[in-house]
Amino acid sequence: MRKFDLSLRSSRSSYFATFRHQLTILSKTDALDEEKWLNMLGTFVKDWFRYESHFVHGRDSLVDILKERGLLSESDAVQPLIGKKS
């Protein structure tokens, strides 16, 4: 998976280009077996949450919408990646 320099403004368009590419591949389910499709979907979701943690603020984020609807608990929510060690 491609790495992004989140300090650059161009990273936002890079994210969108990557998301479009991933969605194109995911929409062609015949080309992938189930395991590869699920792995790619997982990567897409992880990248989307990483994007949101850096660029989306307020109640417009997918994480906030899922929490409001009771589909995501606080313990499931993605924490910002800046300064975090895994």
UniProtKB/Swiss-Prot annotation:
InterPro entries xref list: C-protein
Keyword Oxidoreductase belongs to the record: no
Superkingdom to which the source organism belongs: Viruses
GO terms classed as biological process: viral DNA genome packaging
Pfam family, one: Phage_C
Keywords: Host-virus interaction
The keyword Glycosyltransferase appears for this protein: no
Record-stated family: Belongs to the microviridae C protein family.
Function noted in UniProt: Plays a central role in the packaging of viral DNA into phage procapsid, which occurs in the late stage of infection. The protein C can interact with the replicative complex composed of the protein A, the host rep and the viral DNA after the completion of one round of DNA synthesis. When protein C is bound to the replicative form, the complex becomes accessible to procapsid and serves as a DNA packaging apparatus.
Protein name (record): Protein C
Species whose genome carries this gene: Enterobacteria phage phiX174
This protein's encoding gene: C
